Design a protein with these regions (language model features):
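A charged, amphipathic interaction segment
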Residues: 72-158
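Short secondary-structure subsegments characteristic of cysteine-rich extracellular domains
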Residues: 45-65
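Short, surface-exposed loop/turn segments at secondary-structure junctions
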Residues: 16-18, 41-51, 69-76
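Hydrophobic/aromatic-rich, well-ordered segments within soluble, folded domains that form packed cores
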Residues: 20-42
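Amphipathic alpha-helix face/heptad-repeat signature
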Residues: 24, 28, 50-53, 78, ...
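Short, small-residue-biased leader/transition segments that mark boundaries at the very start
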Residues: 1-6
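Membrane-helix exit/interface motif
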Residues: 36-43, 61-69
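Active-site flanking loop/helix segments enriched in acidic
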Residues: 7-24
């Protein structure tokens, strides 16, 4: 599922995605966004599932922050900030995937969000963009019932930068 695919080490070791809390958040966001994007195409049929996916993601974020020792007083504010960031990224990635601009908008969104703390993804950016497009196409072929059952097939992770 989306909760595991972000752990593929190739993203961190070969592509330079920061292997820290921010980088992990960005990779989770990329993959959860694709699942939610696909569920939106189902209309209201799987609206409850889409909400559950979102809720589980942020419940897990809350739990992870607590395990890292973030105080109870700070958790709400941190999760709210993460949710706001998530929505901004969803809009940017949707726009990038839908744009007919030879990938420019998606590349900019990836450089800004995924590689924002490292000064850009360089050669990795177009490869990760191609991976996202491949995942988006694969998920488009899934039925709503397959998604509801958690049967997701992801594109192979990029293997070389």
């Amino acid at each position: 599922a989306a909760s595991d695919v972000y752990k593929r080490q190739v993203f961190y070791q070969s592509y330079g995605v920061p292997d820290d809390l921010d980088g992990r958040f960005e990779m989770i966001t990329l993959h959860e966004h694709l699942v939610l994007r696909r569920l939106r195409r189902e209309g209201t049929r799987h609206a409850d599932l889409a909400q559950a996916v979102f809720d589980v993601m942020f419940t897990d974020m809350d739990r992870s922050l607590r395990l890292m020792g973030v105080s109870d007083i700070s958790i709400g504010k941190r999760v709210k900030t993460m949710a706001k960031a998530f929505y901004g990224r969803v809009a940017a990635y949707d726009g990038g995937l839908d744009a007919e601009d030879n990938g420019a908008a998606l590349h900019q969104a990836l450089d800004r969000n995924l590689f924002g703390t490292t000064g850009g993804g360089g050669a990795a950016t177009p490869l990760i963009a191609a991976y996202l497009r491949a995942c988006d196409r694969l998920l488009a072929d899934h039925s709503g019932d397959e998604l509801a059952a958690g049967r997701l097939v992801w594109a192979p992770a990029p293997t070389a930068a």
